[in-house]
Amino acid sequence: MKKTKFQRFVYFSSSMVYGDFKKNKAYETDKTNPKEIYGTMKLAGEVATKGLCNFYNIPYTIIRPSAVYGPTDMNQRVTQIFLEKAIKGETLIINGKDEKLDFTFVEDLANGSILAALSKKALNQTFNITFGKAMTLYQYVKILSKYFPRLKYIFKERDHQRPKRGTLSISKAKKLLNYKPYFNLERGMKKYVEFAKSFKEDKK
């Protein structure tokens, strides 16, 4: 690392580092307390990033996304799982009707990440890069049902092993980076469903 000249090291963390959200919004300054392995590993990555970059004098920026979705997403997130089941005509299982996520369209994340990677104001800073407004899983399914009128779903109790999340504050990214997310869930799902349907047709 000493011989490599980095302009900036950008680490993609996760909203899972916060653990259970204690307030209406999660801020970058809030205490991190992950409650499962993924969030723990992401937080460990943040600590390693800060430690190594400080030691080798490398500028860094840490990004915390949440519930990313959009074209080419094959990571078995809830948005992709539900959309895939809807296309196949399978019944959706909603673990927690009122479970909230700050759904973030991939293009907004990409744009925000570029801003964070290039801005001098982002040096050695951590940013929430999300849409900035949480929606429930049920609201997501209702949007999905507009494209799949015969969509069936059942409700089950939320998985208490997973953190209870919600909205991430993006006020810091707005102020320092001029970050302006465009895709609310309605807009984003329109593009996502169009991609998924065209992808299915191409595979025939």
Feature locations, PLM:
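Conserved Rossmann-fold NAD(P)-dependent oxidoreductase catalytic core, especially the SDR/UDP-sugar
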Residues: 1-37
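Short-chain dehydrogenase/reductase
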Residues: 30, 35-46, 76-80, 102-103, ...
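Hydrophobic alpha-helix immediately C-terminal to the catalytic Tyr-X-X-X-Lys motif of short-chain
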Residues: 44, 48, 52, 82, ...
